[in-house]
Amino acid sequence: MEKIYVIYWSMSGNTQAMAEAIAKGINDSGKEAEVQYVSEASVSELQDAKVFALGCPAMGAEVLEEGEMEPFVSEVEGIAAGKKIALFGSYGWGDGQWMRDWEERMSGCGAAIINGAGLICHETPDDAMISECENLGKQIAAE
């Protein structure tokens, strides 16, 4: 069975909880989710993937985490054309600008953003947000 990759970076565990809920939605749909922390992931694994998910919280002045996730996303830009990508992440301040920038960046590389926008969560995901994440996983599995 083809794996659907859910790759994320998390500091506080909020984005990790979102990744795990997205994976549950994928698995509940009869597909196989492969959840990986970004340091364990390889862009080559995504080369042949039609669909995958990337997650990262807002950092600093509403940017992606710069040590591991930013370099990974820069590599993904080279293979993004024609892919369907779900974006997700949590934030503690600001208004989600980091996600809008990320959506624009991936779209600019030729990727289609699932739902047309990333899924963002303010602080810790509550039950309603976990349910939204599971639903996103089901949408990813249906692509």
Model-derived segments and spans:
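Short polar catalytic/cofactor-binding loops
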Residues: 9-13
